[in-house]
Structure formats: structure tokens, C-alpha cells
């Protein structure tokens, strides 16, 4: 199928970024946000809609995540979303994953009415406002997942601040990096994030989608400010800070691999 510009539509891949405000503990409210955003992505004919780190539970859940009943309810909510969204864009969403007596900060890939893959966070932050070592187990490094014609690697937040995870994903066939985050704001944080992510892009030669939460939880403020980088580190999409925003990024296949089209670049602090 050809577009009006004569491009082969099979060489396009659309990712919708859902930069939204999840509420800790409000599984039904967060579920509703997912459904509403998914409908927008479906209308955009996106291939995938992505949500930030631990979105279904809200972040940072602290000791609430240690309650077995809450873990089961969160997993059930993700399963319900998968079943309800079987016809349309795939979904990537953060949530807890239990395996025996181990609990993981994870990223679920939902498609065809089912959970197709679960990515587990490897590097757990244990400093400043984070004490994930107490709450979660460190997962093995997972390879990329396939959605349609694109192989996507998802280092979860802290994992993208270490070169080893991205290196492994690139070596195992990832074509694009999707990084879900719950990254709190402080002055100068945007430049720090982008500099680190540019390093990952240059090292891997892959485009990168950085997706962050927005909103507040206890003493933490999540500023959003999600962005997309092309190989070489070029900034091609910048979402606003401190507000919810849903944006669709169109990737096109070239001889060098997948490249993101240039979109809106919001002013950042």
C-alpha cells in the first residue's frame, strides 16, 4: 500500500507515547487511563502504544508493592487490559511480575489479547529516593521483543544508564530502543538524561524512545519531558514537561535501519 507521498506503508511503524500521570494504588483509575490512551492510538493506527515504568500501580509504590493481594490485583488488571485490547495496537506497560518468591519491576508486552513478553529490570537503583533493592529482585537481561516488523529492546529506566544492557540488546537483534521511566525531576536533569541517552544511541547505532512519567508522588515530582533520538543522537521529538501528553512517532525503514520522523519539539527547562 502506498501513501500519498508514494512511500510503502509497510516500511512505517508507529509508536504512541503515553506520557501520563499514574496514581499509586489506583489500579482501576490507571487501567482507565490505559484504555483511553489506547483508543487514541488505535485511531492513529499505531502499531504500539507505550506507557511508563510501573504505570499500572503508579510509581514509586514503596511497601504497597510488597502486599501479595496488590501484586495479584495488578497482574489481573494487566491481563484484563490485554483481553480488552486484542484488536488494535500492541501495548507496552510497566507493572510488577511475580515468579515464585521473587518480585520484579517489569515491562509487559501485550498483543493479540495476551501477555506476549515480560521484560524484567536488571539494575535496581538504591540511592537518594530509590530503594528498589529492598523491594525487587534483579532480573536476568532479556532480549528484544517483536511487534509487527520491528524488534524492540526495552531497558527499564536505570538499565539504560548502564551500557551493558543496551549493548546486549543491540547484539541480540534490537532495531529500536524503548526506555520506560519513572525519573524524578531536579534542576538540570533533562540535560543529564539526554546526554546519557545520546551515549546509548551512539554506542548502539539505534534510535531511542525515552518515555517518562508525569505527576507527583510523595516528595517526588515526575516531569515527563519524554523524547526520541535518532542514530547519531539527533533529537527528533520532545514532549512537554509537567503535563500529560500523548504523541505518536512515525518510524520509517531505511537502508541504515529504522529512523524516526521529526516531530514537535516542546520547550524544556
Regions found by a protein language model. Name each.
Residues 2-269:
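Enzyme catalytic cores with a strong preference for nitrogen-chemistry domains
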Amino acid at each position: 500500500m502506498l501513501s500519498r507521498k508514494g512511500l510503502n506503508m509497510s516500511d512505517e511503524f508507529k509508536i504512541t507515547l503515553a506520557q501520563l500521570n499514574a496514581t499509586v494504588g489506583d489500579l482501576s483509575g490507571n487501567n482507565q487511563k490505559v484504555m483511553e490512551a489506547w483508543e487514541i492510538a488505535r485511531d492513529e493506527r499505531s502499531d504500539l502504544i507505550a506507557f511508563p515504568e510501573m504505570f499500572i500501580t503508579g510509581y514509586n509504590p514503596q511497601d504497597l508493592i510488597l502486599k501479595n493481594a496488590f501484586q495479584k490485583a495488578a497482574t489481573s488488571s494487566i491481563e484484563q487490559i490485554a483481553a480488552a485490547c486484542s484488536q488494535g495496537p500492541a501495548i507496552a506497560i510497566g507493572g510488577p511480575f511475580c515468579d515464585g518468591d521473587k518480585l520484579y519491576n517489569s515491562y509487559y508486552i501485550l498483543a493479540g489479547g495476551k501477555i506476549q513478553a515480560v521484560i524484567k529490570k536488571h539494575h535496581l537503583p538504591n540511592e537518594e529516593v530509590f530503594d528498589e533493592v529492598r523491594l525487587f529482585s534483579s532480573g536476568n537481561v532479556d532480549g528484544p521483543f517483536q511487534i509487527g516488523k520491528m524488534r524492540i529492546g526495552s531497558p527499564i529506566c536505570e538499565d539504560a544508564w548502564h551500557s551493558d544492557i543496551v549493548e546486549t540488546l543491540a547484539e541480540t537483534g534490537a532495531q529500536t530502543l524503548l526506555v520506560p521511566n519513572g525519573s524524578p525531576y531536579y534542576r538540570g536533569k533533562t540535560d543529564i538524561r539526554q546526554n546519557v541517552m545520546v551515549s546509548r544511541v551512539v554506542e548502539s547505532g539505534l534510535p531511542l524512545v525515552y518515555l517518562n512519567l508525569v505527576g507527583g508522588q510523595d516528595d517526588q515530582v515526575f516531569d515527563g519531558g519524554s523524547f526520541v533520538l535518532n542514530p547519531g543522537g539527533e533529537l527528533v521529538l520532545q514532549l512537554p514537561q509537567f503535563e500529560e501528553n500523548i504523541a505518536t512517532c512515525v518510524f520509517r525503514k531505511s537502508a541504515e535501519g529504522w529512523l524516526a520522523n521529526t516531530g514537535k519539539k516542546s520547550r524544556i527547562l
